[in-house]
Amino acid sequence: MSSNELTERVLVIASGNAGKIREFRQLLAHLPLSVQAQPKDLAVEETGQTFAENARIKALTVAQATGQWALADDSGLSVEALAGAPGVYSARYAASDALRIERLLQELKGIDDRRAHFSAALCIASETNEVLLEVEGRCEGLITHAARGEKGFGYDPIFEVDATGTTFAEMTIEQKRQWSHRGCAFALLDPALQELLHKQNKP
């Protein structure tokens, strides 16, 4: 049975971030899934101490609230010279992407060690309060001294990937899919999710 012959299942993305939802729609386009955004009025409190814990909390909460499978991603930037900050607080470091970038560059002013890594934890949960899949990906790089590139979102313009010498914001969608932390995590999730969907469609 090919993926096109499988019954399409609703998968709710546990996020209100339009850029993140758009990225997941592209990553999941080849699977028999109806990808939807979470309800706008649904707020999930991220109380975990790790990316994996937060992804699990979000996936379980959104799956129960919607009665559908939910995919949650908790990702963030950890800077070595800042003892791993902003870490799980990456999205709450300031009020907007521009302000978050400004704050981080200011905190690294005069610091030579600009090593950093992005982490992405993915979790899929069912409406029956079951964690179906969990994976985590990582991308090594450094923080630039100024923003570079017009694509992407979040900290993308100031994170230069070790393997390419370019920032995420300078990459095409295909390049970012190959090198990003979320792309690495999805490469682990994809075969497991395909297998899960096949099992669900067996009579």
From Swiss-Prot:
Hydrolase keyword on record: yes
SUPFAM superfamilies cross-referenced by the UniProt entry: ITPase-like
Catalytic activity as recorded in UniProt: XTP + H2O = XMP + diphosphate + H(+); dITP + H2O = dIMP + diphosphate + H(+); ITP + H2O = IMP + diphosphate + H(+)
Membrane-spanning residues: none
Domain of life: Bacteria
An annotated GO BP: purine nucleoside triphosphate catabolic process
Annotated positions binding substrate: S15, G16, N17, A18, G19, K20, S75, F153, G154, Y155, D156, K176, H181, R182
Listed GO MF terms: dITP diphosphatase activity; ITP diphosphatase activity; metal ion binding; nucleotide binding; ribonucleoside triphosphate phosphatase activity; XTP diphosphatase activity
Binding site for Mg(2+): E45, D74
Database matches in Pfam families: Ham1p_like
Names of the cofactor(s): Mg(2+)
Cofactor note: Binds 1 Mg(2+) ion per subunit.
Alphabetically ordered keywords of this record: Hydrolase, Magnesium, Metal-binding, Nucleotide metabolism, Nucleotide-binding
Residue positions of the active site: D74
Assembly notes: Homodimer.
Function as written in the Swiss-Prot or TrEMBL entry: Pyrophosphatase that catalyzes the hydrolysis of nucleoside triphosphates to their monophosphate derivatives, with a high preference for the non-canonical purine nucleotides XTP (xanthosine triphosphate), dITP (deoxyinosine triphosphate) and ITP. Seems to function as a house-cleaning enzyme that removes non-canonical purine nucleotides from the nucleotide pool, thus preventing their incorporation into DNA/RNA and avoiding chromosomal lesions.
Protein name from the UniProt record: dITP/XTP pyrophosphatase
Organism field: Prochlorococcus marinus (strain MIT 9313)
